[in-house]
């Protein structure tokens, strides 16, 4: 994992990720793919986002989890948020016992990841292939958060899109980390806390992984 790369005195995280992106670009097979998986912590999300940024400069394309090839909105925002997804998981018995003793729940697994391919082999997410009945002017969003209550929006979730950081109302039923088809409302609201712009997901289009 990226957080276990050996530190070098005087070398920043950005420089470490740039060196790694160069190495991946030089060694990756033209039809290959490289997958980096981190714990779903703030550090893990920052490392994968920094790797993505430098990988693009080296001619690599992030094919997952990113639904676009633009700048990462989470690197641009001042909010302490990061790209990660959670899913239910069953811990080994010894870990479950320890978690109960420490009063730390271990019923889910949170990960940050980045999948890279050579630019010539990668293709942007095809909206019509994933969501045949999607609004032609719509946008694909990657869910980034658990559901949380927002006045006037029900249980909302944050998401990453080609338009930037977004908030999706009434999203309690969407799985964490899923890709969803959304449409842009005529008069989108903004999240007062983060400035995320409102998108409306199309529930008739099944969320994808």
Question: Whereabouts are the PLM-identified features?
Answer:
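C-terminal lobe and adjacent flexible extensions of AdoMet/dcAdoMet transferase-like proteins
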Residues: 82-209
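Short strand-turn motif at the edge of the Rossmann-like AdoMet-binding core
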Residues: 37-41, 66-67
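Conserved strand-to-helix beginnings and helix N-cap segments that scaffold or border functional pockets
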Residues: 14-17, 45-49
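Conserved Class I S-adenosyl-L-methionine
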Residues: 47-71, 76-89
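A short glycine-rich, Lys/Arg-flanked "PGG" loop and its adjoining helix->strand segment in the class I
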Residues: 12-36
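Short catalytic/ligand-binding loop motif for oxyanion handling, primarily in non-cytosolic enzymes
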Residues: 5-6, 43-45, 71-72
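Conserved beta-strand segments of the P-loop GTPase G domain that flank and frequently precede/overlap
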Residues: 4, 35-38
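A short SAM/SAH-binding and catalytic strip from SAM-dependent methyltransferases
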Residues: 1-14
């Amino acid at each position: 994992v990226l957080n276990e790369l050996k530190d070098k005195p005087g070398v920043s995280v950005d420089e470490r990720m740039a060196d790694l992106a160069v190495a991946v670009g030089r060694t990756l097979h033209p039809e290959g793919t490289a997958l980096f998986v981190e714990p779903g912590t703030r550090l893990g999300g920052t490392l994968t986002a920094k790797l993505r940024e430098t990988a693009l400069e080296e001619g690599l394309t992030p094919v997952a989890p990113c639904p676009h090839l633009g700048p990462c909105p989470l690197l641009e925002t001042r909010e302490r948020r990061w790209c990660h997804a959670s899913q239910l998981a069953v811990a080994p018995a010894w870990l479950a016992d320890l978690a109960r003793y420490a009063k730390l729940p271990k019923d889910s697994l949170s990960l940050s990841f980045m999948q890279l391919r050579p630019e010539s082999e990668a293709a942007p997410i095809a909206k019509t292939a994933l969501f045949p009945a999607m609004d032609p002017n719509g946008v694909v969003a990657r869910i980034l958060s658990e559901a949380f209550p927002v006045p006037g929006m029900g249980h909302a979730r944050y998401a990453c899109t080609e338009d930037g950081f977004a908030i999706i109302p009434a999203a309690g039923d969407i799985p964490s980390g899923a890709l969803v088809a959304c449409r842009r409302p005529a008069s989108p609201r903004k999240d007062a806390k983060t400035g995320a712009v409102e998108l409306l997901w199309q529930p008739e289009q099944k969320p994808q992984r």
